[in-house]
Amino acid sequence: MQDAITAVINASDVQGKYLDTAAMEKLKAYFATGELRVRAASVISANAANIVKEAVAKSLLYSDITRPGGNMYTTRRYAACIRDLDYYLRYATYAMLAGDPSILDERVLNGLKETYNSLGVPIAATVQAIQAMKEVTASLVGADAGKEMGIYFDYICSGLS
């Protein structure tokens, strides 16, 4: 896992130079949004179960996927879907705090699309649920923090598509 600070420093270090103006601006922007990110993470942590529940209700609950023959029909499949959405929310929150999506590649996306395809998990429905989670989260944390979290939800969706 990498954070925004490490990314900036590593980029300069690889080139064997001091931090330039652009690197310093990236660090300033990261630190300027620190309190916003911490407050958002606190709200998300306190409301994680409800965020997932509302996202499922908005996107999946009354669709064909939950009816007999659908991919979320059995209780076990439904529970696995809820577990996965909670996992995405948690790791998107970590990425938002770090200001860097690398943890999403390392811990979420590597091999996920292939695994879902082999298990018959509908990727379009998963992306739809993640987008619903993005909306629910933004409504709780506010526009600025919601926009920041949206970057990482979108990153997951892109990785699945």
Swiss-Prot record:
Subcellular location: Cellular thylakoid membrane
Keywords: Antenna complex, Bile pigment, Chromophore, Electron transport, Membrane, Methylation, Photosynthesis, Phycobilisome, Thylakoid, Transport
Annotated membrane topology: Peripheral membrane protein
Coiled-coil region list: none
Single GO biological process annotation from the record: photosynthesis
One cellular-component annotation, GO: plasma membrane-derived thylakoid membrane
Cross-referenced InterPro entries: Allophycocyanin_b, Globin-like_sf, Phycobilisome_asu/bsu, Phycobilisome_asu/bsu_sf
Residues where (2R,3E)-phycocyanobilin binds: 81
PTM annotation: Contains one covalently linked phycocyanobilin chromophore.
Positions carrying N4-methylasparagine: 71
Function of the molecule: Light-harvesting photosynthetic bile pigment-protein from the phycobiliprotein complex. Allophycocyanin has a maximum absorption at approximately 650 nanometers.
Family per record: Belongs to the phycobiliprotein family.
Known partners and oligomeric status: Heterodimer of an alpha and a beta chain.
PANTHER family with a match to the protein in the record: ALLOPHYCOCYANIN BETA CHAIN (PTHR34011:SF3), PHYCOBILISOME 32.1 KDA LINKER POLYPEPTIDE, PHYCOCYANIN-ASSOCIATED, ROD 2-RELATED (PTHR34011)
Protein name as it appears in the record: Allophycocyanin beta chain
Organism in which the protein naturally occurs: Thermosynechococcus vestitus (strain NIES-2133 / IAM M-273 / BP-1)
Originating gene: apcB
